[in-house]
Amino acid sequence: MPQGEGALRAWIDVAAGEVKSVQADLALRQVQLRFPGRTAQALPLERLQGRVSAARDGRTLRFAAERLAVASGSINWPASRWNLARHDDDRAAAAAAAASGASAATLSFDGGEFTADRLDIGALATLAAQLPLGEAVKQLLIELAPSGQVNNLAARWDGPLDSPRSYTLKAQASALAIAAKPAADANRLGRPGWRNATLDIEASENGGRAQLALNKGAPVFPGLFERPEVAFDSFGTKLSWRIAPQTTGALPVIEVTATDTQFANADAHGQLAKA
């Protein structure tokens, strides 16, 4: 943090000459925040307030925030609580140290967990360019252009965040909007999107389930209809999907089922038991 003004109170736990944990209460203004090991421009924040902590336990590095609020330009992130645990990849760290003489602090990561009671994903997407996220995650956020609020998020992954070997995700979202993406082949369906949605989701590398509802919103289906966006006064459906991995280099096969679908708009209303 090369720049900032305000108040900071910190507690540091040291054992056998090593820092084991750090906890700080922050009430800062006009902050320039830079993440370790990153060469990108510092992240400017008008306000940063709350309690943050970091601790190491064996291979696991834990970060936590309580009542953390952030303001930057048009972004006003309300006070929230989150926890992040990232597991060191000992093999990668040893190889890097042997190859370059880097210290033990130069670590790659091999999995972790993340929980949060509330996240403004539009603000997160805007800040993503300066956050320590993988490039694939950043690119996906740019493509999705998400907005809305996510509550009770719990995620776990094994392997690199860009390409995890396995993962689980559970969350609820409201006022959610995600951009659709047409397929490169005009004869194929693109990636669907929606606006003003409520979503309850559980997912893993093998598949998942979700309950989707729209109130004065619209799903977007590129390649399915002449006009891809279909506005609804109300819409609800239960989704389930299975993911079947293919041979190396081939995209996985995804089978999606929709049940208990109900819809109503100015032109029609009805329900479908299964699709």
Where are these predicted regions, by residue range?
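Hydrophobic/aromatic interaction determinants used to assemble and anchor large protein complexes
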Residues: E66-I75, S80-W82
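Short consensus segments that form the blades of beta-propeller domains
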Residues: L189-R191
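Extended amphipathic, helix-rich lipid-handling scaffolds
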Residues: M1-S21, D25-A71, A94-A186, L199-I201, ...
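Polar/acidic, low-complexity leader/linker segments enriched in S/T/G and N/D
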Residues: R81-W82, R86-D88, G101
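Active-site pocket-lining segments that scaffold enzyme catalytic pockets across diverse folds
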Residues: W194-N196
